[in-house]
Amino acid sequence: MENQIHSLLHFPSSASTGSTSNSHNNHHNNNNNNNYNNNNNNNINNINNNHHHHHNYKSIQQHSPHSSTPNISTENVDIYSSHEANSSNGYNNGNNFSYSMNGNFNYNFSPMNSPHHSHNHPDTSNNNMLPLNDSGIHFNQHQHPSSASSSSSSSSSSLSSSSHHHHSNHHHHHPNLHINLPPIPQYPSLNDSSSNGNGTPALSSPSSTTPHPTTPHPTTPTSTPNQRFQSNGSSSFQNQLQNHLENKLSSFWSSQLRDIHKTEDFKTHELPLARIKKIMKSDKDVNKISSEAPILFAKACEILILEMTHRSWVHTEMNKRRTLQRTDIINSLSRCETFDFLIDMLPRDEIKPSRKYLDELSKAQVITPEYLQYLQLQQMATENQQKNNQNNQNNQNKNNQQILPQQRNLNIPHSPQLQEQSSNNNNNNNNNNNNNNSVSVKRSYSMEIQNSSPLSTPKKRSNSQDYNFQYNENNHNQSSLSQTQQLQQLNQQQQQQQQQQQQQQQQQQQQQQQHSQQISQQIHHIPTPSNSSSSLPPLPPHNSNHAHNNNNNNNNNNNNNNNNNLNNNNNNNNNNNNNNNNNNNNNNNNNNNNNNNNNNNNNNNNNNNNNNNNNNNNNNNNNNNNNNNNNNNNNNNTFDYSFNDSKNDEHKVSLNESNFISTPTNDNIISSSPSSQVYYYSDN
């Protein structure tokens, strides 16, 4: 009675003798699970119908080699799906099998990612057993492991408790079965509205045999940086491109699936089957090929070509072109992981973003990080160029400042032209006041006058010119001075030089005045010449010394001329020397004197062109007396004496006095000329 009451409590709608006896036997057989029969299967189905339990049982059987794998059906048969509730969200995301009426099941479209596969319990009319485990024992995933191993409870109570346990827990209390397995994806559940009144799940119509996917078959990943079209680019443009590509691919796959289900005639194909069969036979291990195999390959090749064309055409439209090029195919395949098997065939050098894409980004004023980096690099380059230019200019200025103090205005004079003895060396360079005096040139002229006999011809004089170049270098002082300081120093030096020159001129003028005074005093003691045969009165004894002093003054004046000093008295001395030297011939020829006068006048004219301050009174009245005195007192009554100390003790007196009367020549007088008024006499 206890067993019958127990069975009535748990099986109210299916109380029969067969069920009670079977449950009683199962209760007393210590839970012997190997003795299941068809009656137990009926009891299980009755329990499911009474409790309206409509759930997809799942097995943890992973199709091991010990278990028999189910037959895969590719035929168009009536099947019912377990994802009718989520038909609005697209096809099932899980990797499920759906059993057909004949016991077969079909794969869904997406590949298997999880080892758990849901299946529906078939109808009781087929008398199909539930899936068995490796030992042949029925194993239910929804049953707790402890309930399967309990020996005190009966099979009916364990089955009923498992059914109630399913509604309460919904397989959340089985962590031991999922330790080493990946996470289970969310499977769809059937609603109450999808079941009939008998509790059996509703069958789908024949038109819903093939689910229509709403997402494309292969998706284009954008996770890997090497396969992105523009890494960290414009998100809006990238999203638009991705959505456009997904829409095209989804419509493509949906149309292809419709065409596949509608095809009934397999006689016409886009690709030649003979060519495909020939390619298949290129493998030596393949002996025979059925007629259906090339059809599958032909369709697969057709779909592959069409999908690649759709992907590449998006790139052609993006580049604003109407012709599909090889680069478009390469870029489209490199952006999708499903075509990684073709990665070795693609030239990686041609994978680059197009210019039109960058142009669109610039027109849309979308600033990407790459473009910002590019602008920063350009700014850095321009700044570096400006810095380099500034540094170069600074270095050049420094070098110029260092070189300018070291520059020396070396005015090396030209080699002087050797002139004849009759030419006057009147180098009064008054225009060279601004020249630097870093180079000082000293010229010393030594003039040797030979004693001439009365009948001897004049000999050429020998000139010796000595050039002593003295370079005054003060590099350590000048390098520390700036340009302005140098100019100031130069001006100061020039002023000092001018002052020195003025002092020298004043000294010379004083000397000349003294000399003229001495000569004027001596002239008063000279008597007038007479017609007698007596010679001229002797000159004072200091005249010889006076001649030597005149020669010394001439040498000093020549040295001062080369130092850019204004020595105008040098002309007189040089003229006197020339007259003295040329008039020692002791001849009665007046032409010699005239030639000397012409030479002297030419030289003096050249000097007058360069020296505007010379107050030269050139008496060209065939007179040898070129009194180019720079004194303001140009007296015609002055007498210039030039004495030549020689063995013959010949003296020359040049008289400019107009009242002087020339006397005829005597034996004692060497030569006389009224025009020149020069007298030669000897102290005999």
Swiss-Prot record:
Bias (Basic residues) occurs at 163-176
Domain of life of the source? Eukaryota
Q: Which GO terms describe its molecular function?
A: DNA binding; DNA-binding transcription activator activity, RNA polymerase II-specific; protein heterodimerization activity
Annotated Gene Ontology cellular components are: CCAAT-binding factor complex; nucleus
Q: Which GO terms describe its biological process?
A: regulation of transcription by RNA polymerase II
The segment annotated Disordered runs over 1-74, 112-238, 414-487, 511-650
Q: Which UniProt keywords apply?
A: Activator, DNA-binding, Nucleus, Transcription, Transcription regulation
Record carries keyword Nucleus: yes
Q: Which regions are flagged for Low complexity bias?
A: 21-49, 142-162, 220-238, 424-437, 478-487, 511-522, 529-637
Coarsely, its chief localization is: nucleus
Q: Where in the cell is it found?
A: Nucleus
Regions of compositional bias (Polar residues) in chain numbering: 58-74, 188-203, 414-423, 438-456, 464-477
The record describes the protein's role as: Stimulates the transcription of various genes by recognizing and binding to a CCAAT motif in promoters.
Q: Which family does it belong to?
A: Belongs to the NFYC/HAP5 subunit family.
Q: Quaternary structure?
A: Heterotrimeric transcription factor composed of three components, NF-YA, NF-YB and NF-YC. NF-YB and NF-YC must interact and dimerize for NF-YA association and DNA binding.
The name under which this protein is listed is Nuclear transcription factor Y subunit gamma
Whose protein is this, by species? Answer: Dictyostelium discoideum (Social amoeba)
Q: What would be the name of the gene that encodes this protein? A: nfyc-1
